[in-house]
Structure formats: C-alpha cells, structure tokens
C-alpha cells in the first residue's frame, strides 16, 4: 500500500477535458504542418516513524532560465518545438489555458498535453508528473532535458512496447506475506497479503497461456525480504518484474483509484516521497531501464483503468521503492485499489473482480517478442550522472 498524501491527484474528467481541447485545437495545425512538411519500501523507510507527519507534495526547484534567454537549447532546457521537429512531429499546438499557456503534441499514438509552470501532464488522458515544470523562454515553451529524454522520448518518440522485446521470463511479486500482512480491508478481517497472492496466481495462468515463462516470488503465505525478492528475479534471469499491491489511506475512507509506479530517473525529484529522503543524485541498477520502466507502467496503467472505470491517480515515479531499485530489468509496482475505501474493498474482495484485474494486466503485457535470451537493452547513459552535472 502507499500513503496517498504526497504526489498529484486529479479527476479523470479534468484529463478528459484537456484531451478534448488538444484534439480539437490541433487538427488544423497538424494538417498545415503536414502540408508544409512496507516490503516494497526501501530499507531506510523501514526505520522511519510508523506514522510520519503529513508532508506537502514535493515541488522540486525549477532551475532558473538562462541569463540571456533565447529560443536556443541550453545545458538543462530544450525548446519543445525543436524536439518535436527532430522527432518528426507537428509543432506544439497552443491551447491558451489560463493562467499559464498550454500545449498539445499530436502523434499517431495519441496526444500529450502540458502546461508551462505546472508539473502535471497528460498522455492519452493518463496523468504523468514531469520532473520539472515546463518554462516559457523568449515566448517559447521549454522542457528540461531530463523530461525530454526520460518522459517524452519513451512515451512519444520511443519504440512502442519495447519492454516486450526481451527474454520471455517474467517474475510476479505478490506483495507482503506471512507476518507482514499488508493493509487490512475496511470490511473486516481480510488482508492485502491474501488478495495480492490470489491476483498473482490468476495472472500467472493468463501469462503462461500468452507464452511467458512465469515465476512467483511466493506461492503461499510466507514472508519475504526485499533482498529475497530481488535475488529471486536475478536467479531466474527475469526479463520483467511486476510487484502487486493494494492501497490504504486509513482512517480516510474517501481515497480511491489506481496508481502505477516506476523508479525515478537520476537527476529528477520524485513525484511521491512519503516524507522520506529523495536525493536526485542517486543512481540505482534499475535506472538503466528508465525508458522501458515508463513504457511498461504506461501500458499497464491504461489497461487497468478500463476495469470498471477506476479513478486515475496517475503513473508515478518514486525513489524509495526498494523492491524496484535493485532490479536489473524493467520493473514496476501496481497499486490495484484502496482497501480502506468501502466501495473498492468490496470489489477487491470479489474473485471475479480480481480476475478482471489479472486479465487487464495480461492484455497490457501481451505476448513476448522473443529475439534472444539476453536482458533488455540498457540505457548506459542513465547509469551515472555526477553531482557536478546536477548543480546549478
């Protein structure tokens, strides 16, 4: 489960409205341009207070604009229109959203909507917090180069579903287990640990039918440490890793919805911290798969949202997820709903509903495109970013 008090939350209606504006406003410009040519937390988190004081959403500082602004790329910021041109896309379509300008990027795969001065963006209606709020420089929208490389490029400019082009072995990690029960259902004496295991078993059957070789980190009610879960994936030379959880905001019963997590890229601030430390200079083994992580999280999250219209809490990035940090493969963590919300707890308690969750995940993962038994291609440039390169 995840404490919902940090990060960005907005209604799906707002996302839909932005997409409608983007699709309506960009059609003409596109034609014109065409004509022109707990067990998942870090060990450090385990020593934190059981109930940390509420902290406001992390707002990473925005680097200042160049001293002599111009419509040119800088060391840390790049013009959005130039990036679009380099990737064969139409120029950004202005949306004119008050109080700050908005822009839509139309592609054959969908629409990406952002606003200057705000970190929250949308890709096909799904929330994606950027690492840095886009800026206006010399009258043009600029994005931080890390967001261009680590967010836009994987979602818009990258090869679709590259996470499938890997070895066909996948490890499914049912969260919690044994004396680590996870969160308790608001409806009674049922716990997260049993629901995650049932979800994983259902998913195992479906993925096996699709051609994946599937291993579960646990197949019964036992406790596993973080290091054991990571070592299990290493032992089986997994190509993908999925950790399954259910959320809680107890005693608050109103919070609801789905969240999907991947590791924060080096150099960015996390969109969720839960009050724990978040050093952007840190690099972990899983940061070598930043692009695949985001693509995997995106496909899985969009598929899960189709299950009875869950509230969209977005694709999030966090650095304190110890079960992801040490993975040498694309890896994500899914929060499949709130056991502290009576309506969602009733759904989660229904085996038919857990089957739908499993089917949604299996649909998103599809069939593996087996090319070799080697691990997925690593992004070597993401492995080390010096502290000097992060300083202003």
Kindly give the residue locations of the regions a language model identified.
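A residue-level detector for conformationally permissive "hinge/kink" positions
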Residues: 9, 17, 117, 167-170, ...
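Short, basic, low-complexity termini and linkers enriched in Ser/Thr/Gly/Pro
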Residues: 3-18, 53-65, 367-392
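Active-site-proximal helix/loop segments of hydrolytic enzymes
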Residues: 190-374, 379, 385-392
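Primary recognition of N-terminal secretory signal peptides and signal-anchoring hydrophobic helices
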Residues: 29-191, 195-198, 203-206, 210
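Residues embedded in well-ordered secondary-structure elements
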Residues: 14-15, 161, 249, 323
